[in-house]
């Protein structure tokens, strides 16, 4: 490989700080809620809104009682014992540092500076050598000669004013007017250049078909018409165009200076030739290029004749000779010797040489007819360029090629144009002034430089100039792309020019590698301008790698990527050593080096973040270089070496200060490992940091012990300073709760960030940390209780406000502690399911929640106890209200009282606590109404209707359209009991009796096998209108006699009595000394089917124990609804006395619900109610207590 350029002389700019974007962590939970509305309409008595929305957010500002401002740098000294504020301030800084290290960084840097990029190094010695005065004079003469002897047509973006161009040259070469005039005179006296026209016949399209097969066999004849022939007989030319054909009657022979012929393309109307010709020009202003396109015939040897004509081109009378050849060739054809053969002509072109643009022309020309009788169509694609073949200049005479002359002229003009525009700017894109561009275009054309050579020259000059005075990389990239495009079209250069290009590419690649070596200095990731410049530089290097000529003259394909990797590695090591020597010199003792090593590790992490989010995608997409892996591996290994050595040195000297530094250092090293693991396909077990946690374990344990003590001291100080008042208008808790929640949140976040990798060790650390959290939380609630107990005016209203704050504090800390404990889940790979707490910690967590819930309920009971007397007073007001007033008027005082009280509580309590208070008040109200109902007997139905209205109004009030308690909880428990009481109190006596039997039917399925079983069979005989009830047998009855047996018999009766008023009860025989009697007795009851279909209609079986000496004992009962009996619900099938299937009934004893119906009937004064109650009480005398 060729040596790469000169040495990189300029030094780097000053060290640039790669800042770390650190987010703010920690916010105190606040509780916000819409205020509860006041009672706007007493009649509606519905509370519209009681919801509050507490939230637990960490404050971005400092927590109460902390220092006035957080320190900007991590504290390096040990904190004072008992100073929890300083300890947690230090911990907050560690958490802030880790906030930006969660997962993979974004693939772009959100905060980038738009300031100018750092200046790149320049070295004037890397440019082209300065010209000697004599060489400058020759270059000046070369430029003047180019302007004075220009030829062709100037383009619209070029300067056509000769004086303007000469004046520009005088200015850029810095000559006086006298010197300038003398130079012009010398050049004018020089011999004019020899001009030539380069013609490339590329292709034609849409030609006319001349052959029977629908195609033609086209070929071109072209030549230069000299001035003598082109200007004579203008009248004849006006009638017809010149053509290379046989003579006609219209004029004499038309000589051609040189006639060239292309190949014949058979059977096509769109021929492609791509043939090139060079014609000498005598007079640029008058000579013309003429081109004919003919259809070739097999029997005509015109092409051969033309080729023979070119061999004698020096003879006089060439035109007549050409005419003779045409005649001879045509004579052998089918046409006569005097015919025009117009069918063979396909079109012609006449192009004055003076109309050829200076830069050449590459376009399609429309074919023209030679006379009005000709019929042509189609276009011909030509490339024309006017050049000079001999130049009378000093450079030409000394053998300087046009390539070298143009290089010197371009370099001179580019340097002067740049210095005139923006001498110190790196954004200049090589925009030359119009005179400069015109002169370079003229010189390039006259020197016969190909587009590839011009592109190579522009690249060589600009890339060299860039190393002396920085240019815009987009300009250089454009030059490389232009050069590559032209190389693909014509990949050939003289050997000397190829070698010159190779040196240029090699020098630029070396320059780029030196910049990449100092990547962080010249292209900082936080500077958008610098990153964009880096992208363009990489594209330039990538273009060198993919540039076809570089494969032949510079072996970049196999070496450039390795060179880039080597430059990046060397730059990484230099950057690392610079920070290490500045922050943590190896000459210092371990404890003094530790803070600096923390800074170094943080700098490495931040650098790798920038590398991943900014540099990696650029290098990979453009050069296919994995810069992130390369950088990570190298820096991670260097940091790991320092960490292993330092921990081994500091382990025997473990102090609080050392533990703090090691703990912070480990967090960053663990972040590095997680960073690598978070990338798909990467495994940190292969890193040098693998297993680094082991030597840090003693420091972590010591730090956790200090954390426990510091948390208690911090909470003690917060409670001491607390006034038990909300911290602001938007909060419902006091300052100590905010501090406690923040501390617990920090502990949980710290554990998450620690993510200790060893499962067994993590179990022990997590369990201990969780116990510390529980202990600190209970410690705080105990401090609160002592605080509120010592508040003055314990019996006054102020205590209620303080209790509300305490209740809110307990709720906030309960949630904070629960959230913190949830974060102490098992690490991946530990025993047990992921996310499950260890059993001791889970037990501690449940115990903590129970204690805090109990504490909250105690405070809630204390708050609501002050409202019990008032609630009873307002309920009594409802019960004593006369029937003459409306229900809403009777309820209004209670609703107004509740609205006022709950509005005050809503303003003071968070949602969870307000719900707890609402539930307590709801239960108080239900019990008060139940007591009022029990205290009032023999009252009107309006009394119960009023309380029914009150109950529904309270449900709406406490539900508050979904903003209060849910309907499911409101309509449960005591509400159901009260609702049933009100319903039954509103019922008639017979409805109450029916409810009594319905309750019996419901209770038969609640208890099984406790009091035995009874098998019966029932059916209804429609023909006789009677009900047949057959008692079959019983089993597992209760032993009611001293001998362990019973003498059971069964009483069979129909109920309710008012449905079957004429039916008497019947009984079976007594079966002595048995618990499994068999009866097989059939009883008939003459009753109508309609009565049996009533909802409460049933057969009641009562099993009694016969006692000869005293009252019979009650053994159990069972009820069977008649609605499902065969013959009642559906017609009897099969007939017979024993139709239907046996039914097994489980015996039971009346439950409280059934007995309550009896108590409701006791208050009735009607005869029917009293007789029914008397009968039931006689039965109760026979009952014993439930076993």
Swiss-Prot record:
Record's function text: Functions in endosome to Golgi retrograde transport. In response to calcium influx, may interact with SNARE fusion receptors and membrane phospholipids to mediate endosome fusion with the trans-Golgi network. By promoting the recycling of secretory vesicle transmembrane proteins, it indirectly controls dense-core secretory vesicle biogenesis, maturation and their ability to mediate the constitutive and regulated secretion of neurotransmitters and hormones.
CDD domains attached to this UniProt entry: C2A_Munc13-like, C2B_Munc13-like
Necessary cofactors: Ca(2+)
Gene expressing this chain: BAIAP3
UniProt binding sites for Ca(2+) 2: 1041, 1047, 1105, 1107
Listed InterPro entries: C2_dom, C2_domain_sf, MUN_dom, Munc13_1, Munc13_dom-2, UNC-13_domain
Keywords: Calcium, Cell membrane, Cytoplasm, Endosome, Exocytosis, Golgi apparatus, Membrane, Metal-binding, Repeat, Transport
Subunit structure as annotated in this protein's UniProt entry: Interacts with ADGRB1; this interaction is direct. Interacts with endosomal SNARE proteins VAMP3, VAMP4, STX6 and STX16; this interaction is increased in the presence of calcium.
Family affiliation: Belongs to the unc-13 family.
Binding site for Ca(2+) 1: 211, 217, 295, 297
C2 domain sequence ranges: 176-335, 1010-1136
UniProt-annotated binding residues for Ca(2+) 4: 1107, 1110, 1113
GO molecular function terms noted in the UniProt entry: calcium ion binding; phospholipid binding; SNARE binding; syntaxin binding
Region called Disordered, residue ranges: 55-81
Tissues/organs with expression: Predominantly expressed in brain. Also expressed in nonneural tissues such as breast and testes epithelium.
Protein name per Swiss-Prot or TrEMBL: BAI1-associated protein 3
Residues in MHD1 domain copies: 663-784
